[in-house]
Amino acid sequence: MSNDSIKLIDEIGKKARKAARQLAWLDSGSKNATLHAMADALIACKKILQVENEKDLEAGEKNGLTDAMLDRLRLTDQVIASMAEGIRQVAALPDPIGEINHMRRLANQLQVGKMRVPLGVIGIIYESRPNVTADAAALCVKSGNAVILRGGSEAFHSNRAIAAALAQGMEKGRVPSDAVQVVSTTDRAAVSALLKADQYVDIIIPRGGKGLIQRVMDEATIPVIKHLDGICHTYIDADADPAKAIDITFNGKMQRTGVCNATETLLIHEKVAKTILPALAKRLNQADCVLRGCPETIRLVGEVAPVIPATEEDWDTEYLAAILAIRVVKNLEEAMDHIDAHSSRHTEVIVTENHATAMRFVREVDASAVMVNASSRFNDGFQFGLGAEMGISTDKLHVRGPVGLEGLTCEKWIVLGDGQLRS
C-alpha cells in the first residue's frame, strides 16, 4: 500500500469525520433545500458532465469495454435528468433522524427510549455506473451521514464531475461540502487504504461484481453491508395456482435477468410438475431462456423444449443471464432443504394457495425477503415503498434487505431523569 494513498485517505477521512459532526443534526428543511440545490446543479452542469463523461467513454472503447458496459457508463440528457429527479425524490422522503421510539417510564420515573441517529461516515466502493455517485450522495446527506465515494476507474472523470456539481449545490445550502467526497485517484491501493481507515469510516458498502465484494470482505477492517450472490429460488407448491405459478416464475427469471433478485432456480412439487412444467418450459424456451434440469424435469418436459442436464454446480450458480435451473422435489421439506443448502439468503419465493404451507415457508426459510405468490423481482427499495436504496443486504447485522434511509442509521438509548441515583 503506497504512502500517497494512505495520506490521501487520511486527509479525506479527517474532513469527512468533521463534516459528519456538522451534518448529523442539521434540520430536515436545510437538508431538503440542499438536495434540491444539488439536483439543480446537476442539470446546470450537464454539458460539463458530458464532456468529462466522453473522456471515460473514449478510454473505455480503447480498453475494450463491452457495449453494455459503455451504455451503463454513458451520461445522456435522460440519465442526468433521472439522476436529478432521483435526488429530488430523496428530498421528499421522511427524515428518520431524531425519531424517538419505545419511550417508556420506569418504576423509578426514569424515561428510557431510543433515538434514531446517523451512522457517521460511510465509505462506498462501486463499479461502472456513475449515477451511483449522485444516488449515494443524496441518501447519505438525507440520513445525516458524510460519505467517501470510490468509483471504478472506468468512470473516473464522470464521478469527479458529478461530485463537483453536487458540491456547487451543497455550497448553496447548509451542508458542508466535505460531506460528499470522491477519492480522486485510480490507484487501487487507495481502496485498500479506505477499507482499513477504521479511525474515520464507520461502514463500508460495496456495489459491484462478486470480485469487488469478495475483495472488500477479505480486506476490510470496518463493518461491511453487502450481498455476495443472488441465488434466488421460486418454489411451486402442490397447491399452487398453475397460471400464477407460470407467470410468477417467468417474471422472476425473465423480466430482467442480470440482477441480484432474478430467480435462478425453480423448485416444483412432483404432484404439479407434470401439468405445469411443459407449459412453463415452452414459454421460457420461446423467450430464449436456457433450461438446465434434473432427470425428472427432462422426462416431463420431453420434446416441448430442450433441457440440458443440470449438474451440482448449477444449484450454486448465480447466472445473471437467461438461464434457469429446474429441480422436481417430493414435498415442501425437500424444497426447503434445497434452499437451505444452496440459497444466498437473498430472495425466496413460494407459489401456493395453501395458507398454512405459505406461513411455514415464511417462518422457516432464511432470506432477506420471502415472497408468497409474488415475483422475486419485488425485493427492491422502490418496490417496497422505501424510495431510493443503497443496495440489498443479505447480512443479518446491521441491516437486512433493501438498504434505504433507515438502513443508513442506527439507534442510541436516551434516558431522561430528574436527579435519580442508583442505590
UniProtKB/Swiss-Prot annotation:
Main location: cytoplasm
Pathway: Amino-acid biosynthesis; L-proline biosynthesis; L-glutamate 5-semialdehyde from L-glutamate: step 2/2
Gene Ontology cellular component terms for the protein in this record: cytoplasm
Coiled-coil residue spans: none
Organism, as annotated: Magnetococcus marinus (strain ATCC BAA-1437 / JCM 17883 / MC-1)
Biological role: Catalyzes the NADPH-dependent reduction of L-glutamate 5-phosphate into L-glutamate 5-semialdehyde and phosphate. The product spontaneously undergoes cyclization to form 1-pyrroline-5-carboxylate.
Reaction(s) the record says it catalyses: L-glutamate 5-semialdehyde + phosphate + NADP(+) = L-glutamyl 5-phosphate + NADPH + H(+)
Leader sequence residues: none
Pfam families assigned to the protein according to its UniProt record, in alphabetical order: Aldedh
GO function terms (MF aspect): glutamate-5-semialdehyde dehydrogenase activity; NADP binding
UniProt-recorded name of the protein: Gamma-glutamyl phosphate reductase
PANTHER family the UniProt entry points to: DELTA-1-PYRROLINE-5-CARBOXYLATE SYNTHASE (PTHR11063:SF8), GLUTAMATE SEMIALDEHYDE DEHYDROGENASE (PTHR11063)
Source organism superkingdom: Bacteria
